[in-house]
Amino acid sequence: MRLEITSKGMDLTPAIKNSIEKALQKSLKITKSLSSEEHFKVFVEKTNSPEEPFLAKIVTHIFKKDLVVTKSGKDLYAVLDLISDDLARHLRKEKEKHYV
């Protein structure tokens, strides 16, 4: 798995990196059967919004198109959990379209 992590407005700590890798494990199980090389680009950002100060975005390429999932919220770790669930759901949907 190739993983590119970019942050804006915050330090990328080892705990955040581990949380991102853990969050992508669910999606990795789905993509292993679809592609020989998984490539995920993850962007995390601390915004100026008091309601939703954290933004996370995951981009991956599957079935000749880019799949982009974006979430925001008050807690970065909760946002990472939400975005990983959303990404897994979208990947399953794409897999069913092409293999069922």
Could you describe each region identified by the protein language model?
Residues M1-V100:
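N-terminal, polar/charged subdomain of small-to-medium soluble alpha/beta proteins
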